[in-house]
Amino acid sequence: MKKRIVTIFSVGIIALSITACGKSSGDSSEITKKLDFDIIQENLDTAFKNSETYSIYNSCDIEYDSDGNDLNIIVAVNDSIDPSLSVDYAKYAISTINYEAQRQVEGLKDYSNSDNYYGGLFDDVDAFITVAPVSASNEDDYFIFESIPRGSNREIKLH
């Protein structure tokens, strides 16, 4: 009987430990529920349009799927862009999206280009980023086609 109680107690503690370790500093759904992705989209477009550095930008679209807590980022650039610059466009989009999320939710961590840390929003969502020329008709034509699992520091590379 004593062994059975100890076993049940041990299993309970292990289950609680696993559950506690799986939580981030904030519940993902609680963070993203506070965000207005339409405002983030508008401000991202404005940031690209007003930037002299990213003048070959054509459009950017973000789509958030709350069921999977997924964020899709699609940046369309003019066909004349040097493909090697598309990594800069991707990082600019990510840093701007995180900055706009920080304006809406207190406590999200900053983006850091030096160590491929994409910021607090990207700790809580799985992201997928595509940078492609406007003439792209299939995946083979994309410059960047990269997934960024939540909390990872995966480097963005050319496709």
Give the label of every model feature segment:
Residues M1-F9:
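Bacterial N-terminal signal peptides that target proteins for export
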Residues S17-A20:
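C-terminal motif of bacterial Sec signal peptides marking the signal peptidase cleavage site
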Residues G22-S24:
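Bacterial signal peptide processing site
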Residues S29-N50:
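Post-signal peptide N-terminal segment of mature Sec-exported envelope proteins
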Residues K49-S80:
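Short edge beta-strands and adjacent turn/loop segments
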Residues N50, E106-H159:
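Polar/charged, Gly/Pro-rich intrinsically disordered segments
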Residues G68-V125:
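Mature extracytoplasmic domains of secretory-pathway proteins
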